Design a protein with these regions (language model features):
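Acidic, Ser/Thr- and Gly/Pro-rich intrinsically disordered linkers and low-complexity segments
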Residues: 28-29, 204-234, 276, 327-336, ...
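Core helices of alpha-solenoid repeat scaffolds
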Residues: 17-22, 64-73, 104-115, 146-155, ...
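Alpha-helical solenoid repeat architecture
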Residues: 2-9, 39-58, 77, 86-102, ...
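Acidic, serine/threonine- and proline-enriched intrinsically disordered linkers and terminal tails
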Residues: 341-400
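Flexible loop/turn segments at the boundaries of HEAT repeats in alpha-solenoid HEAT proteins
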Residues: 14, 54-65, 100-108, 140-148, ...
């Protein structure tokens, strides 16, 4: 690197970008700097590197040309775990910016740095190399995987970790590196092959045995804590090793099989620690040791992917309560917050929706892969998941989720939505969810998530629909306007175009929730029509009877608003006439609920003469309505009687034509049959009134 002495005397405004870069590196290479100054210099360097890509496109030389191997050593040296957190954080951003700006040359220099440090093999060099690898893994996973999978590297970690004299910082840095590496499938497989045995040894170490064995080997050894601790793994190191093992057990490598420890070296016992044992270790750590909360939560986040662990954790009331408290106190967007949310998401997750054909195909594949022995895990069935959801809810999770939703990231919001979605599957919990703020949470999350996050937004909308199906809108929307729920609900009326299978349940639930909202006031009805009428109308033609019925029920409530009824069915347009035909046809459907919903809509619509004119103009119009009067259902007979009474009550030409058409279609006989079948005073009264008018017509 060129020296900075020649440029130090110039003011920063007159320096070229290359000279500014050299000057910053000169400052970073000097010792004895205050942390604030180091952070500031790293920040300035990061800014220069971030700007470099755009400026080089305009023809300016890149500042990476003056960044040599020594400079790279300087930047990544600040990733050392022994550096203050603020310095490490800024160095991480700077390293990321450098790798982006330098491209392949940057990756080459970083690779050379890593291999050089590992080859030196001093404790200090190991610490820095391992810290760099763990930090850049999320930034450059391909590069870091290549470094860790270098021939001989992972096997060399065993002798290092089994040394008689332990360096806690080396061990911590090494385990942090392996922890990060487990995000990658190939690395996870290699760690399982080369590292699982000594990881087991660390986790299984008994401190008392370590002291006894050491004294037996060397009776003259000083057995005070200070000396012995250098010969055994610290509690923190054991906990980190347990987390790595949990990741290996929870997400086994494809070729590792289900026989942990099968790659054991001669004389080394096979791995025996199960995921359930690791889980118990993490829960004990969570409850008894506040100093290792982050480690315990990270371990449980992976361990709780397994069904047995889910069951044990859900039944452990003390641990559940502690997890809720941990989430409550976790900083927004922190790893601790994300880890705790992941645990609750795992505990409450239902199996994904599958068609019958998909279920059969999945069973056949599982049967073939397991040689005819594999059965579905009963602990993951809906009954067990529902019970876990109940226990999680009773632990007080909802108010905490509501609080964290205000400051959540996209990832944490997605997990939060997933948890509420699962809890809302249980109808008995929906009212309490609404009371505790779940409706506000879901509306806020749906609004906050970018449109590109379609899946979590649809999940939030469906959870909202479920809660609103089972609750009174007047009680739910005391602080939040109920119009805020309309856009999320209408967004899932149309089935997900990106889904592999056509799932109509969200459509059905959205229609039911909107029907509930439409029962409240005309403003809400108008908002629903403006937001989604075309989508609602399309569902009338659904081949799924429950969906088409739900659409008619919604329309039945929407037309309670005179303004909406006239705008949709009474403006005399061709579209309005066609809509009348469709509702008439649905009043003649085979399904009783569909006929009932269509009859309810017509009972409101026939208050308008233009709609009556449209009905009587249809040859099948009057007969369909009279069939309602003859129906075996008292409710349908009531609807039919109201419709007929409305039609004949109109004055002028419309009423006269309606009376004539109905009488010609057999209205007197139909209403006579209706009154004989009915027991309800309301039905009998309206039928008698209608008959009196029609008999006068005759």
């Amino acid at each position: 690197m060129a020296t900075a002495a020649s440029v130090a005397s110039d003011g920063p405004q007159s320096l070229s970008r290359q000279d500014q870069t050299l000057l910053l590196f000169a400052g970073l290479m000097e010792g004895g700097k205050e942390d604030e100054e180091t952070v500031a210099n790293l920040g300035k360097l990061t800014k220069l590197l971030n700007e470099d890509a755009e400026l080089t496109k305009k023809g300016e030389p890149s500042i990476t040309d003056v960044i040599d191997g020594d400079c790279v050593d300087t930047i990544v040296g600040y990733l050392d775990m022994r550096q203050p957190e603020a310095v490490r954080g800024r160095a991480t951003l700077c390293t990321s910016a450098y790798l982006k700006a330098a491209g392949e040359d940057g990756k080459k220099k970083l690779s050379e740095f890593f291999h050089a440090r590992v080859q030196r093999a001093t404790y200090d060099d190991f610490i820095v190399a391992f810290c760099v690898a763990s930090t850049i893994f999320p930034i450059e996973p391909d590069l870091t995987s290549e470094l860790l999978l270098s021939e001989g590297f992972l096997p060399s970690l065993g002798p290092l970790m089994r040394r008689k004299w332990k360096s806690r910082k080396v061990e911590t840095a090494c385990l942090d590196m392996l922890n990060a590496a487990c995000m990658n499938a190939l690395c996870r497989e290699a760690v399982q092959k080369y590292c699982v045995d000594w990881l087991e040894e660390i986790v299984d170490q008994d401190p008392e045995d370590a002291v006894t064995n050491l004294h037996h080997i060397d009776p003259g050894v000083n057995t005070q804590e200070g000396s012995i601790s250098m010969r055994r793994h610290s509690q923190h190191v054991q906990n980190l090793a347990a987390v790595v093992l949990a990741k290996l057990r929870a997400v086994p490598a494809p070729s590792a099989g289900n026989q942990p420890g099968q790659q054991s070296e001669p004389g080394i016992p096979s791995a025996t620690t199960t995921i359930e044992e690791l889980s118990k270790r993490f829960t004990k750590m969570l409850v008894d040791d506040s100093g290792h909360v982050q480690t315990s939560v990270e371990g449980l986040a992976y361990a709780s992917l397994q069904s047995k662990v889910k069951e044990e954790l859900a039944r452990d009331e003390e641990s559940l309560m502690r997890l809720v408290k941990t989430l409550e106190s976790a900083a927004p967007k922190s790893p601790l917050m994300y880890g705790a949310l992941s645990i609750f998401a795992n505990l409450t997750r239902y199996q994904p929706f599958e068609t019958e054909e998909q279920k059969k195909l999945k069973q056949l594949k599982a049967y073939a892969n397991a040689g005819g022995k594999l059965q579905p895990d009963p602990l993951n069935d809906d009954t067990h998941v529902a019970e876990r959801c109940k226990r999680v809810f009773e632990a007080g999770i909802t108010p905490v989720l509501v609080t964290h939703c205000k400051t959540g990231s996209v990832a944490s919001l997605s997990l939060t939505i997933s948890i509420i979605f699962s809890l809302s599957m249980t109808p008995a919990l929906r009212g309490q969810l609404a009371q505790q703020g779940a409706v506000r949470l879901l509306i806020a999350a749906w609004t906050a998530l970018p449109e590109a996050e379609d899946k979590p937004r649809r999940t939030a909308a469906q959870a909202l629909a479920r809660i609103l199906i089972s609750t009174n809108p007047a009680l739910v929307f005391r602080q939040t306007p109920q119009s805020a729920a309309i856009r999320p609900l209408t967004s899932i009326i149309t089935p997900d175009p990106n889904a592999e299978t056509r799932d109509l349940l969200p459509t059905f639930e959205a229609l039911l929730a909107l029907t509930n909202l439409a029962s409240t006031d005309n403003d809400t009805r108008g908002s629903i029509v403006r937001a989604a009428w075309n989508d609602i109308e399309e569902q009338l033609f659904s081949t799924n009877t429950r969906v088409s019925t739900a659409a008619v029920e919604l329309i039945c409530n929407l037309v309670q608003s005179p303004e909406e009824a006239l705008s949709l069915f009474g403006d005399g347009s061709v579209k309005a006439e066609n809509r009348i035909k469709v509702v008439l046809a649905l009043a003649d459907a085979e399904d009783e609920k569909t006929r009932s919903a269509a009859g309810g809509a017509l009972a409101s619509l026939t208050g308008f003469d233009v709609v009556v004119r449209g009905i009587v103009s249809q040859p099948r119009g009057p007969p369909i309505l009279l069939d309602l009067c003859r129906d075996d259902s008292e409710g349908l007979r009531h609807r039919g009687a109201v419709i007929v009474n409305n039609m004949i009550s109109h004055e002028g030409e419309v009423g006269k034509v309606a009376r004539g058409k109905l009488v010609a279609a057999g209205a007197v006989e139909a209403l006579t049959e209706c009154v004989k079948k009915s027991r309800s005073p309301e039905v009998i009264q309206i039928v008698v009134q209608t008959l009196e008018v029609l008999l006068e017509q005759k």
